[in-house]
Amino acid sequence: MASSGVAGGRQAEDTLQPPPELLPESKPPPPPQPLPVAALPPPAAPRPQSPAGAKEENYSFLPLVHNVIKCMDKDSPDLHQDLNALKTKFQELRKLIGTMPGIHVSPEQQQQQLHSLREQVRTKNELLQKYKSLCMFEIPKD
């Protein structure tokens, strides 16, 4: 009987796994190496604030118009209040639109700017293709 206990104990020892500190997976990963300055992506440009510091809001007139129509159907005394709310909403948006950049530019000037920007993109793409075709940018295949 004693021999069976020893054999059973050996089997139990064989099935035991080594402590976690000896397992290769439990080693902490090496600290990440800092990227070279050239490899860092450019910082994201901050989103331009809308003029007058306005928040991103939904400027839908549909709810206000719906309220006005409901009040007209019911002959509600709140009709003037809803109409004034709609009127102030229009005024706020007129001010906001007036402060937007480029609103003063005529459509002809906008077309000229668009044409010149497209021309710049075309020439830059051509230059980029030329630079890509140079030998120094080819990556050797191992």
UniProtKB/Swiss-Prot annotation:
It is found in: Nucleus. The keyword Ribosomal protein does not apply. Keywords: Acetylation, Activator, Coiled coil, Nucleus, Phosphoprotein, Transcription, Transcription regulation. Its main location: nucleus. CDD domains: Med9-C. The modification N-acetylalanine is found at residue 2. InterPro entries: Med7/Med21-like, Med9, MED9_metazoa. Residues 1-58 are annotated as: Disordered. This is Mediator of RNA polymerase II transcription subunit 9. It comes from Mus musculus. The lineage of its organism: Eukaryota, Metazoa, Chordata, Craniata, Vertebrata.
